[in-house]
């Protein structure tokens, strides 16, 4: 039985009970991390208990990054022999196909020659959209026609939009809410770089999506991205603070040829390291080991 995250932990235990089944528990993030590295009470405490229970009951625990593995071991006392790491994967072929970037940009009120930054993810404190907005004034000083597209929804969306208005940068921002399917893939392919400014990031699937679309990333050095991003090869690592984010984006916008080269390297990484065929073989190896 292979369960993913706390929601599936009770089902894993029920199927396993009295049947002699081996079980594996994969954790993609922790409640502690999703709460901004805080241990809250109430429902959050119940979720943490299910995470602990899944780790305790299973024969093997898989984390999606070494950083997350260390966090899980610290939180739930998982022994080394039981814990391992398998990165997330992606079907990079889903991002193949030609588009007209200028046409996609026009759909969102962005000029065809405007340097464009894409943020994709939940609009919550953990993911740091407010940090990107705080970086925009620095970037506009050197690249006044830059645009920043936010694709995602969440509890911080309206607060982040108000922040953009308060800082006088709303004219450079496009808040699209939840976007999926071909519209999201086209956004990845039309942008110039993808920013991942998270305060806590167990892995960062968005990075693999950006690379599959051939785009460089400006990604936090906190958590999983610090392991998978090769600095100045397929993106830039930054600290989760506005000045560092501005430096990363500004560096890419200073040399678009170099930025495109990083994006091509990202595509190579998606194909050679993170394809589902490779990840599936690693999971099968765990199945055969228990």
Where are these regions (language model features)?
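Short hydrophobic beta-strand element within catalytic cores of glycosyltransferases
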Residues: 207, 216-219, 229
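A short helix/loop element that forms part of the nucleotide-sugar donor recognition site in Leloir-type
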Residues: 42, 96-110
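Aromatic "clamp/platform" in nucleotide-sugar-dependent glycosyltransferases that forms part
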Residues: 199
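Nucleotide-sugar donor phosphate/pyrophosphate-binding loop at the beta->alpha transition
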Residues: 22, 32-53
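Carbohydrate-associated surface elements
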Residues: 67, 89
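Short alpha-helical donor nucleotide-sugar binding micro-motif in glycosyltransferases
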Residues: 178-179, 186-191
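Conserved donor-binding/catalytic core segment of Leloir-type glycosyltransferases
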Residues: 111-127, 133-136
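Conserved acidic donor-binding segment of nucleotide-sugar-dependent glycosyltransferases
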Residues: 231-232, 236-242, 251-256
């Amino acid at each position: 039985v292979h369960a993913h995250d706390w929601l599936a932990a009770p089902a894993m235990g029920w199927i396993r009970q009295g049947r002699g089944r081996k079980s594996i528990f994969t954790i993609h993030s922790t409640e502690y991390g999703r709460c901004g590295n805080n241990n809250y009470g109430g429902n959050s405490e119940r979720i943490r208990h299910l995470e602990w229970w899944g780790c305790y009951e299973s024969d093997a625990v898989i984390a999606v990054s070494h950083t997350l593995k260390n966090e899980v071991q610290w939180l739930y006392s998982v022994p080394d022999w039981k814990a391992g790491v398998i990165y997330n994967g992606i079907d990079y072929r889903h991002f193949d196909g030609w588009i007209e970037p200028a046409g996609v940009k026009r759909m969102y009120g962005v000029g065809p020659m405007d340097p464009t930054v894409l943020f994709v993810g939940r609009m919550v404190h953990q993911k740091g959209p407010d940090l990107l907005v705080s970086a925009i004034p620095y970037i506009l000083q050197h690249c006044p026609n830059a645009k920043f597209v936010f694709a995602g929804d969440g509890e911080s969306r309206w607060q982040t939009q108000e922040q953009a208005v308060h800082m006088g940068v709303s004219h450079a921002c496009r808040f699209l809410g939840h976007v999926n399917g071909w519209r999201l893939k086209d956004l990845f392919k039309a942008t110039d770089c993808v920013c991942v400014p998270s305060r806590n990031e167990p892995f960062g699937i968005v990075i693999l999506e950006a690379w599959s679309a051939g785009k460089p990333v400006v990604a936090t050095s906190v958590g999983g991205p610090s392991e998978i991003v090769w600095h100045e090869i397929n993106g830039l690592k930054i600290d989760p603070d506005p000045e560092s984010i501005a430096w990363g984006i500004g560096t890419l916008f200073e040399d678009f040829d170099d930025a495109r080269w990083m994006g091509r390297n990202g595509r190579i990484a998606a194909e050679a390291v993170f394809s589902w065929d490779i990840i599936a073989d690693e999971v099968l190896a765990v199945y055969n080991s228990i």
